[in-house]
Amino acid sequence: MKKNRMMMMIWSVGVVWMLLLVGGSYGEQCGRQAGGALCPGGNCCSQFGWCGSTTDYCGPGCQSQCGGPSPAPTDLSALISRSTFDQMLKHRNDGACPAKGFYTYDAFIAAAKAYPSFGNTGDTATRKREIAAFLGQTSHETTGGWATAPDGPYAWGYCFVRERNPSTYCSATPQFPCAPGQQYYGRGPIQISWNYNYGQCGRAIGVDLLNKPDLVATDSVISFKSALWFWMTAQSPKPSSHDVITSRWTPSSADVAARRLPGYGTVTNIINGGLECGRGQDSRVQDRIGFFKRYCDLLGVGYGNNLDCYSQTPFGNSLLLSDLVTSQ
């Protein structure tokens, strides 16, 4: 009798343990079996929709985060040295560049500390690719290069800090009213424009940019922060550039139908899709890709997939940014 009771207890404990295991497994399903969900902790999602970090999960058929859990966060300077930064933006301090002396390595590193996920998400290759993508897109926005420029057109990023041929860019909004005498034209690496964007950005980084928009063109740390704010911030229906380039964004069925897939091309769509995407071959898109490829090569990382947006439907026609290339 005692033996039977003991066997029943062992059997009951075993059943409960199995149920706990099954229940825990169901809580960690991912991929197409779970509506595109990502695994917690950066773990791989296997072809069958389960989370883990071994070859069974991260190997052939892996659906997402296939590099496994991210390494511990590190200072950005461990991924991009001062000398590499100077090589990437080789002619930014050329005498012909109005931004000479403004965009410094130290300002870039200091600004990035306000956004600890930037360059710190995913495996080392993903982190480097994000840095290349950010500098590639912003180099296009501030380029001073031309087809036959010394060292090629993609060595002339960060030549400008202010938009050429600027306008006022003031739209009457009660939440972010234009300050008297101020203009909200494109400034900084991402060429942020319009009063409501200066207002949102200033609120996020703790600076009164509505009343002092020119801080984006006179304080190099604030200037980089403005670009990183845009990069890291989702503005519905657009995801953040950060989430797209690090594959944390899962496209909806509407995105897939619009050919908006994870990759550098969708970042271009976020930034200036209304003018550049869905138009077939476009020299502006090619320019963005040229910078990106050069920077990936210097960082020793692959380009990833979906580099252009030639066949993508734009997210929308409202523009956050003022593109230097189109304003010439």
Swiss-Prot record:
Pfam families on file: Chitin_bind_1, Glyco_hydro_19
Induction comment: By ethylene.
One BP term from GO: defense response to fungus
SUPFAM superfamilies in alphabetical order: Lysozyme-like, Plant lectins/antimicrobial peptides
Swiss-Prot/TrEMBL catalytic activity: Random endo-hydrolysis of N-acetyl-beta-D-glucosaminide (1->4)-beta-linkages in chitin and chitodextrins
Biological role stated in the UniProt entry: Defense against chitin-containing fungal pathogens.
Active site: 141 (proton donor)
Keywords: Carbohydrate metabolism, Chitin degradation, Chitin-binding, Disulfide bond, Glycosidase, Hydrolase, Plant defense, Polysaccharide degradation, Signal, Vacuole
Record flagged with keyword Nucleotidyltransferase: no
Alphabetized InterPro entries for the sequence: Chitin-bd_1, Chitin-binding_1_CS, Endochitinase-like_sf, Glyco_hydro_19, Glyco_hydro_19_cat, Lysozyme-like_dom_sf
Tagged with keyword Coiled coil: no
Coiled-coil zones: none
Organism: Phaseolus vulgaris (Kidney bean)
Name of the featured protein: Endochitinase
Family indicated by similarity: Belongs to the glycosyl hydrolase 19 family. Chitinase class I subfamily.
Domain Chitin-binding type-1: start-end pairs: 28-68
Catalytic EC class: hydrolase
Major localization listed first in the record, in broad terms: other
Propeptide boundaries: 318-328
Signal peptide: 1-27
SS bonds (residue pairs): 30-45, 39-51, 44-58, 62-66, 97-159, 170-178, 277-309
GO MF annotation list: chitin binding; endochitinase activity
CDD domains (alphabetical): chitinase_GH19, ChtBD1_GH19_hevein
Compartments reported by the entry: Vacuole
GO CC annotations, alphabetized: vacuole
EC numbers, comma separated: 3.2.1.14
